């Protein structure tokens, strides 16, 4: 990075310094021992493997000073220090959770908050302000590639912006994360960056404007959306409670055009409810702030804010946020966004009304289920803000209007319902205001007059959520993230596939996007969670629990992602099911899901609000809402059609799913970029990482999922030169085996394979890179470290050997010196006393002076020699300096070229490396030489020493020079090679004149070929036109695009192979083409490419365009052009330093052009050779056209784009070649010099012919240019010919596609026809069903008529029973009571029930009075006429049986009426459903016809485009003809080409729009087809269900008719039996009178037993009733019944003993009665005994009476509970239906019980008659009956327990067993009637007991008065008969009233 960047204060937070990197990478590391181990607090900590563990799969790890034994699969590898704080985690050689966490932790500690992870950019919230978002930082990232700058949000944003401009593709940025992670802040920074970039592009056009700009408006949307959509949460003070997708539109030049916003998943519940520690939306607190004090008065906010319940449930203030300042920003943003003052005020008024509405109070009216307002102050304030009438508003809340049948009535609401309605209205109103705000912002940001060509979308949405309590909102948020993760996986898979395909890697691709498909289908597919939730919302009586049960039954054990939730732990809430997402298993609770999904509103309140006169905004936001009354009125006005809210019932899930589908469709059409925001800790503390929290977010955000995908492929990759440079040490010989880096890389890897260090599966070699599996790079790094250790060890040992050897040599020299010194010293000691030596010492100085001259001469000679050597060294130094200067210049040129091409090639970098090393060596050598020369000059006096030293230095210098010479030789060779290339180019330019002659000869042949090719091209274009016409048909079958993509990829790969093969073959044809034309063409192409780059960069476009214009003018005026070229060349020579970079680039491009020229020349030669075979090839093409009919539309579209790209490339090549022609001519220095020489010679020969000569030269140049143009046109013809061949192949494919897609279209048409026929059949079926319903109605009427007849028969039978009217009236009164009770359970209304209750009470009072009178009279009657009473009892039993039959028939009649009514209602519902289905079918047909008409319009548009294309083709043919004629000039061709390009672009744009429109229409057609299919299947399913129900109904009705017929027959028989019974009564009444006394005595004892039996039966009946009402209490009731039964049994035993005693006394009384006159004394004794027994019996009777009173009280309480249970009738009916499985079995048992009851009644009658003579036997029979009743009670209990057990198994069969329940009820009623008969008998027995008591006390004293008593009894009998007559009349009147 540049020094300027490093000076920025924010740079330290973006990238580490070099020193920090070295420090991080220098830590010790051992890949085999350093590991990560799990830690509870830190997540993972680093440890060192100490050794193997006690088991084979364990190791001992030392971490934190402790040894831990762990399993091997738990520990994770540590990455080498090279990857410490790496900027892209996908480069990690060990991709594991611990390494990812450590990398993020270490970078976050250094405040490097941005980190790449493959396609992700992970950002961690720093919890403090960092200077990394300033304008200076933004300018750093503008125009830079992602790899050039450190990770940053701006880098990703700029990449998206550049991709949009370069690839002409829409972009999207997906910013996700949990609340508080920084999504909103990053979104704002992204928007500001795009606004800055777009504005910078626009500034040049609109400089100096003062008005509000679009950039300002885009930025100002944030305060508005944050005020209404953000709130304080526990984690975040400014949390966005909604998701948004912001699309920023640009034009083709990158200028900001407009912006629009879409929002998702607004948290509506926050406006009425806030959790502790949280706050409502900011706007409520802002309007209450002090920014506009008068605003509070205007909004009637007179109370403290803490008094407003809706906004004051938790926090009121936020630390660090000033609501006054924020409100100022919000209000100013409203102004910037062009909100009018009225709109602002209306919006504030609605917010104030919301606060007032939360304080409205209501109370419950006494004794009514109706709420009423508790004060109207707050309601008046709210209505004042709404602009509506307060009375209407309150009435709409407490009494909304609902539709019942066909009428509208007011429904009373209780307090809870009113409060719930207020909350629902508050949520709905706020959501609509927020939607209006977004809509208004979009209207403001929609700028007119600027093209909206592309957009960049920014998605800010909540990330995955796994809470302790997960509800409806979490399901949808997680579903959205599931879809986004699938989108990312698929996108990453596509990029990996493209990368591997581009590099030629063979790999089996895995679409990881399919991994999440199962979970997504579980949620959104039919019978999925959302589908079943929507279904439950329309099912009557559905609850959240039924939804949970259905989900469990449908998916548990059947779907892998649906699980049973585990029990809650800790703070976890209850869950009903669990689902496995990619981020983990989530436990969901379904409470309130139905209400949240339906989100109902009070239509009456909405109608009141829509009528507001003072608040226009309120009217506007409710304008699109249609209430039920409005829909009914509209339907009535439109012909009786029914409708609901907006014509259909839309649940929240439906709306969410629709918006989500739109979002995913939009994202799939863009190039995505991913930003993942992370919360580091819950404490909001900067610099601290909570490992568990971060790992959970990485999982939820999909970062770890992305790493998992990386592991499956080859995540690590390295460029070939980099790989060779770094790992050449592993195979030095192989690294130098070739100049091709790819070959060297392959050789190195092969050497490692031979060494058994790697295998073939661990890597792949691509065209430019080497790809490695995860962990392989670390292994190779270890091998490199080992190799370096070996080399360094060997090097150190060699140095040690050298130093030791040198030391030994020095020591030997020292030893020799010592020896010499010692020898000389010894010699001196010997000579010092020698006389001759002394003489020598005296003469020696004189001899030395004499020889000084000789020494000086010698030294002078040596000096000369040294000076000569020094001069040589100096000259060598200068030559080295010159070489150094040359190398420096060459280096600067190469560096400039390298900088210009932005990266250069690996070969140039290697050359630069070698040149730099050579330069350094040369510099070092020069410095050494300079030092040595200076030393020679300074130390000239000591030449002897300097000479030795100089010699040594010269030797060293020679060695250095030799090394430098070697390097220079290499550099000179390379330079010579480049110069040779330049010379060859110049030679080629010199050979132009020679080639022109050859071209003239070939011109005619080429022209002939050209004409032939033009004809062929026209034929092919005709085929192309045919293909275009067929394209309109092909565009109707776009649904096969995905399969076509795969085939296209394979074909594309084959095409690329064939293309490379053809390109290799074309290289041999280079020598047959004009070299200058080819160079010109290729140079023009390179210049065109350069112009595109300059256009993208926007820096040098004006200079290049001026240069192009100058060159165009020079082509027209050749002489002036030559002069200008000379001036420009001179200028170029003067500014050579500035043009070196461009020249180097042109030189490189020229080399590339030469290669491409070779290829195209070979292509032309092959094309010319193939022209002779053109006819046969055309035949082959036609045959191929027939063979390739099965291709699809997607392939056609891609081929079309490819053709367009090729045409565009050819056009661009033409322009570029024409422009580069001028530059090439500037390089023709030799020609220009020759031209100068010729002009000079002409001037010297004759000045008069200068002008003529110049003109002649000009003509020659024009001829040459024309010839060049001809050559160029010839080349273009060749290219067009080759293009034509390719187009022929493409057209063949297109034709094959046409035929295939026509077949598919025919299939679709047939399918459509089938669908139409199915619709017709469905309509016919509906009509048939309607006809069947009409028949059913007729049958129902017949049944009703039959029932009326039954009623008449019943009335006749009732009227015919005058003789038994007393019993009949009693039974009818009981029937009326049970009927009232039955109706009170839900079949009649409360008012009718009260009316019936009053009537029944009156009847009961009358009956009680009559009963009292009758009892008083019957007492005396029974004394005298016992016989009559006995016969009456017999007749009563017969009447009871017949009345039971009559009651059964009446109940059957009522049940049948109810069944008929139910089926009528069902038939009406079915008719409604069929009508709705018919309407839907009509609507679908209408939409299909509309789509067909739109498709026809599109076809017409396509036909128009085809005609335009044909015109375009005709123009191309005209241009080709003009080219062959050579008559156009360069400027005309240039203009034509540009015009054609523009037309082509317009045509292509029109075609793209048409294709897009057609795709949209096709998708609509497909959706409609799916909907039609669903509707058809649903209709068939419903028809099948209704047919089954109708069949069951017919069967049940048939059974009912048979039962009624049988009942009628039985009733006729009963009537005959009654007549016979009447006669029998008349004959038997006298006999019964005689046996009265004995019966009374026997009945005294029997009554006791019967009373106990009555108590037991009554207990059983009470238990049955309680079981029906409260199933949960049945066990307790039965336990109580068992206790009472035990008591009854004990009492029964006591009574048995007492009866035995009384039997004895009775026998004695009989004997005494026979001998009454003779044994009076004995009777008195017996009378005393009877008196004692009487007292006992009286006590027992008193006890029984008390018990009877208790039971009567219980009966009254039961009746009270029955009245209260009227509201629970529906639930009881539901519970009854659940008992239907055993209904048949219970019916049989109860029939048998009924039979037993009848038998019991007969036995009782027999016992009554037999008691006269056989009292003891009667008592025994009573005991037997008691035992049988006990057994029946136990059996009934067991059967009821079995019914309870079968309850849970029979819910699903409730509907099927509906009619069986009715039969069960009837049987139960019969049983109840039997119980009532027993009760009546007990009453009679009670009276008989009283009479028996009187007889027992007075039988002796009043024996003589019997005759008088009989007379009195006769009188009372007459009175009783009159009473019976009166009672019979009452019964008749009551029956008539019924």
Curated annotation (Swiss-Prot):
Region of interest (Actin-binding), residue spans: 660-682, 764-778
Residues where ATP binds: 177-184
Protein name: Myosin-1
SUPFAM superfamilies associated with the record: Myosin rod fragments, P-loop containing nucleoside triphosphate hydrolases
Origin: domain of life: Eukaryota
Extent of Basic and acidic residues compositional bias: 16-27, 920-951
CDD domains xref list: MYSc_class_II (cd01377)
Location (main, coarse): cytoplasm
Keyword terms, alphabetized: Actin-binding, ATP-binding, Coiled coil, Cytoplasm, Methylation, Motor protein, Muscle protein, Myosin, Nucleotide-binding, Thick filament
Example GO BP: sarcomere organization
Any further remark recorded for this protein: There are four different myosin heavy chains in C.elegans.
Residue positions, PTM N6,N6,N6-trimethyllysine: 128
Gene3D superfamilies xref list: 1.10.10.820, 1.20.5.340, 1.20.5.370, 1.20.58.530, 6.20.240.20, Kinesin motor domain, Myosin S1 fragment, N-terminal, Myosin VI head, motor domain, U50 subdomain
